[in-house]
């Protein structure tokens, strides 16, 4: 089998080795935190290897709740040599429900602003489900954050346009916030991934359509509501695509115990690890890598051969 980069912005998603208090319906990682042992040193060792691979453009920290332990989070960021994006609910971390501890919040915001490696935040705010933890109103703190914020709105029920408009209204004046409607991946198949479904039809009649894009396992439709970007994202449950003897990789996953995988089914594959870490030699057929000369150069030099750049 030959591993191929499936999308231009190939990223490495890392599950932080500490859990959150939420129980989101669509969450795929809750069981992991019950069954596996957290090992930050093993994760750091994998990050250092990933840093070398020029195919991988960025890191994503997810969880769990990355911002629940800023000290440990900083340890992970310190060893990264690529931009990192953080998935978070931006909880209040208050001891008393319904209160906001300003000092803790400002510490969190300073952490984000002062980390040059943090490229942005992906903040979850769901229309039909409340979190177990109190979360901060984005319109209260967004103007204090110097990074882009993508507001992820996961759909768990039928899409109601009027309800959606009311839901996002407080965020429209915020210049550093874009809205991303995310379909429940459990309801998407390869046959419906690129279809103009009911949500798309409602959005295009209400907002200014810009473009559509994506990769083999996801689709993004972009619209504008004045100066506010609204995107509609659909993704498949699995990020790996197999055709013949080729495996197209669209995401790289590192779990809380430092194991690395090519798909969300979390099945170990030593061939994949050799591809990611450059532990194989190119044969005469390198056509799949012609568009990535930097990767070819890195692989050759890693194996003691003369590079091409």
For every predicted segment, state its role:
Residues 1-45:
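Canonical Radical SAM [4Fe-4S] cluster-binding loop centered on the CxxxCxxC motif
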Residues 40-47, 100-112, 160-169:
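Short, acidic/polar
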Residues 72-74:
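Short alpha-helix within the catalytic core of nucleotide-sugar-dependent glycosyltransferases
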Residues 126-248, 252, 256-257, 261, ...:
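Radical SAM enzyme [4Fe-4S]-AdoMet core and its adjacent flexible, acidic
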Residues 11, 28-40, 54-69, 81-104, ...:
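Core AdoMet radical
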Residues 47-52, 76-79, 109-115, 140-143, ...:
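Leucine-rich repeat
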Residues 1-4, 252, 257-309:
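Radical SAM enzyme core and accessory elements
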């Amino acid at each position: 089998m030959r591993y191929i980069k499936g999308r231009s912005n190939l990223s490495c998603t890392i599950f932080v080795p500490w859990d959150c208090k939420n129980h989101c319906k669509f969450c795929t990682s809750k069981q992991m935190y019950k069954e596996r042992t957290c090992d930050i040193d093993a994760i750091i060792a994998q990050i250092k290897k990933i840093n070398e691979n020029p195919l991988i453009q960025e890191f994503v920290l997810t969880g769990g709740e990355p911002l629940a332990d800023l000290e440990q989070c900083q340890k992970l960021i310190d060893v990264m040599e690529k931009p990192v994006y953080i998935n978070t609910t931006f909880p209040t971390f208050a001891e008393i429900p319904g209160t906001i501890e300003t000092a803790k919040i400002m510490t969190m915001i300073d952490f984000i602003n002062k980390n040059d490696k943090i490229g942005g935040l992906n903040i979850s705010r769901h229309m039909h489900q409340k979190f177990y933890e109190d979360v901060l109103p984005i319109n209260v703190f967004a103007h204090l954050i110097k990074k882009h914020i993508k507001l992820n709105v996961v759909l768990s029920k039928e899409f109601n346009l009027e309800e959606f408009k009311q839901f996002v209204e407080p965020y429209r004046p915020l210049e550093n916030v874009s809205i991303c409607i995310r379909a429940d991946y459990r309801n998407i198949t390869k046959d419906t991934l690129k279809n103009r479904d009911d949500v798309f039809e409602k959005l295009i009649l209400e907002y200014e359509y810009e473009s559509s894009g994506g990769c083999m396992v996801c689709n993004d439709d972009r619209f504008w509501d004045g100066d506010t970007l609204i995107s509609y994202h659909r993704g498949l449950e699995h990020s790996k695509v197999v055709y013949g003897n080729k495996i197209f990789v669209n995401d790289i996953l590192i779990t809380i115990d430092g194991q690395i995988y090519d798909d969300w089914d979390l099945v170990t594959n030593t061939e994949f690890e050799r591809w990611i870490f450059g532990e194989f030699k190119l044969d005469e057929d390198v056509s799949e890598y012609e568009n990535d000369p930097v990767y070819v150069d890195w692989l050759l030099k890693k194996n003691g051969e003369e590079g091409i750049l």
